[in-house]
C-alpha cells in the first residue's frame, strides 16, 4: 500500500541538498587545513561566516566559495558571472567581499572552488589546470566577467588580480571515505606512519569543524569570531597529538587483558575485532 501511496506525495530534497553542500564545505576545509599544516603556515580556519571557508593568517585572509555540479558539465563564464533572479551571481557574491574591504585591505585571495572545470568564451575547457587566475583568462571572457561585476557590484573598476577559479575533485557520494584516505596520507607524510585510530581521529576533526560551522549567531569581535567559528592550528595539533600518543604498548596491554578475561576463543575473537575497529 505504502509503495504506491507514499510516492504520490510531494517531496522536497532541498534540505538534503543543503546538508550535502554543508558537508562538502566542511570536508574541503579540512583538506585545506592539511595543506596549510604541511606548508608550516600559522592559520585559523573559519567556516560559514563571511564565506564558506576562510583561511585566516596574521594580517591577511583567503576566502573560498564552494560550488558543486552533479552533471559534471563545465561551468561557463555566463554560469559564474551572470546574475540570477535575485540579481546576484556566483562570482559577484565572492567579489563583494573585496568591494567591502578597505585599501590596503585584508583580502589576499578570493577563490571559487568547483568540482568541474571552467569553460571560457574561447571554447577552452580548463581541465588540466587546478587553479586559474581570472586575470589570465582570454580577453573576451575577462571583459564579460568585468562587465557583469561592474553592474552587480556598482563599481567603475574591477580588479581581479586576487581572484581565482579552483577546479578540484570532490566525491559527492562518499566524501568521508575520500577525506579519510587523504587524512591518512597526510599523517604518513608528516609523521612517517599511519594514525592508530584513523577513523576516530577523522570523526573528531570533522565534528570539531561541524560545531564551528553550525554556530549561527553574530560574533561581537574578532576574538569572539575565532573562539566561536575558528579552528586554530593549535587546536588542530592538539587533536593530532592525542592520536600519536596512543602507543603500540597500550594496545598490546589491552589485547593481553582480553586473553586473560576471555578464555573462550569466540569471545576473544569478537573482543579483538572490537579493539581493531576502535583503533583503525
Where are the language model's segments positioned?
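Catalytic centers of nucleases
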Residues: 14, 18-19, 23-83, 89-90
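Acidic metal-coordinating catalytic centers involved in nucleic-acid phosphodiester chemistry
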Residues: 1-16, 69-280
Amino acid at each position: 500500500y505504502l509503495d504506491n501511496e507514499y510516492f504520490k506525495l510531494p517531496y522536497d530534497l532541498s534540505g538534503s541538498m543543503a546538508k550535502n553542500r554543508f558537508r562538502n564545505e566542511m570536508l574541503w576545509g579540512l583538506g585545506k587545513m592539511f595543506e596549510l599544516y604541511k606548508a608550516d603556515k600559522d592559520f585559523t580556519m573559519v567556516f560559514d561566516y563571511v564565506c564558506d571557508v576562510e583561511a585566516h593568517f596574521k594580517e591577511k585572509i583567503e576566502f573560498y566559495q564552494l560550488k558543486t555540479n552533479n552533471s559534471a558539465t563545465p561551468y561557463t563564464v555566463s554560469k559564474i558571472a551572470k546574475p540570477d533572479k535575485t540579481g546576484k551571481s556566483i562570482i559577484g557574491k565572492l567579489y563583494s567581499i573585496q568591494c567591502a574591504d578597505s585599501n590596503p585591505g585584508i583580502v589576499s585571495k578570493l577563490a571559487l572552488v568547483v568540482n568541474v572545470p571552467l569553460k571560457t568564451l574561447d571554447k577552452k575547457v580548463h581541465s588540466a589546470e587546478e587553479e586559474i587566475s581570472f586575470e589570465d583568462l582570454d580577453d573576451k571572457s575577462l571583459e564579460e566577467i568585468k562587465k557583469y561585476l561592474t553592474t552587480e557590484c556598482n563599481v567603475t573598476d574591477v580588479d581581479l588580480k586576487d581572484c581565482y577559479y579552483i577546479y578540484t575533485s570532490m566525491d559527492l557520494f562518499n566524501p568521508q571515505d575520500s577525506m579519510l584516505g587523504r587524512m591518512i596520507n597526510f599523517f604518513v607524510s608528516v609523521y612517517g606512519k599511519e594514525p592508530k585510530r584513523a577513523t576516530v581521529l577523522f570523526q573528531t576533526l570533522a565534528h570539531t569543524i561541524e560545531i564551528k560551522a553550525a554556530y549561527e549567531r553574530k560574533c561581537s569581535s574578532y576574538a569572539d569570531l575565532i573562539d566561536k567559528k575558528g579552528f586554530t592550528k593549535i587546536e588542530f595539533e592538539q587533536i593530532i597529538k592525542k592520536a600519536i600518543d596512543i602507543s603500540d604498548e597500550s594496545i598490546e596491554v589491552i589485547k593481553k587483558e582480553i586473553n586473560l578475561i576471555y578464555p573462550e576463543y569466540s569471545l576473544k575473537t569478537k573482543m579483538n575485532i572490537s579493539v581493531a575497529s576502535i583503533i583503525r
